[in-house]
Amino acid sequence: NANALQAEVEFKQQDIFDWSSSEGTWEVIVSNPPYVTEEEKKEMANHVLDYEPHLALFVPNDDALKYYEALADFALERLSTAGYLCLEINQYFGTQTVELLFSKGFQEVKLLKDFKGNDRMIVAQKSGL
């Protein structure tokens, strides 16, 4: 996509629980972390369960926001002053994820809905302009 759009974009793959080797400051961090709870597995279509790596999908029922907490810590450390953190989220944890980001120190947090009206995305700014 970056080549097709002739955009100056740098993509990084990072273990969010071990970012000690990460360097630099970022303007935007985008993540679609695992967010489906084990309880929700029974609601998922077989074609997803059969072909998607479960490591990329599921989180423990009792720690559903663990990736968001780690992403918030990373983003606050690595984002520029007015940088953005953009996240796909579990529709059932929209309010809790917003509260988590505010409690971590983000100044602006917007919860966005998908085309079906479900909470689906968060755009958070480290500090307001």
Where are these regions (language model features)?
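S-adenosylmethionine
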Residues: 1-128
